[in-house]
């Protein structure tokens, strides 16, 4: 079946240094509370427990140089530089060695968060 009930977003493609082809971004996996200084900055208890994981939609990704409008209804649109790893092979419960071998490349990513919304929802015990 190829028909869909609504139009699907295009898969974002990012340029790759010294390559004529781009890297398609199908999924974005993120790691939270893996940086103690940032956890302290956010006002949460700094512990050494395992970090937590979450996803972001590649449909919301923009390439470098694109202007991102300040979202209405927020007072604190926060930015963070992130290390981005691009995988060249699928992984599931991989060893550290297999995970390293699956890395296609790396780059920089700018994460934008509506921090006031995040803090308000955290106070309500919401993710």
Write out the residue ranges for each language-model feature.
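Catalytic-core "active-site belt" of small-molecule-metabolizing enzymes
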Residues: 1-127
């Amino acid at each position: 079946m190829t028909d869909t009930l609504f139009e699907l977003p295009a898969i974002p493609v990012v340029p790759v240094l010294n390559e004529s082809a781009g890297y398609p971004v199908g999924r974005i996996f993120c790691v939270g509370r893996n940086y103690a200084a940032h956890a302290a900055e956010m006002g949460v208890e700094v512990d050494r427990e395992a970090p937590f994981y979450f996803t972001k939609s590649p449909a919301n990704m923009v390439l470098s140089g694109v202007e991102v409008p300040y979202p209405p209804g927020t007072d604190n649109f926060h930015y963070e530089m992130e290390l981005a790893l691009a995988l060249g092979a699928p992984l599931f419960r991989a060893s550290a060695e297999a995970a390293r071998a699956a890395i296609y490349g790396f780059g920089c990513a700018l994460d934008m968060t509506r921090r006031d919304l995040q803090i308000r929802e955290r106070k309500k015990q919401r993710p």
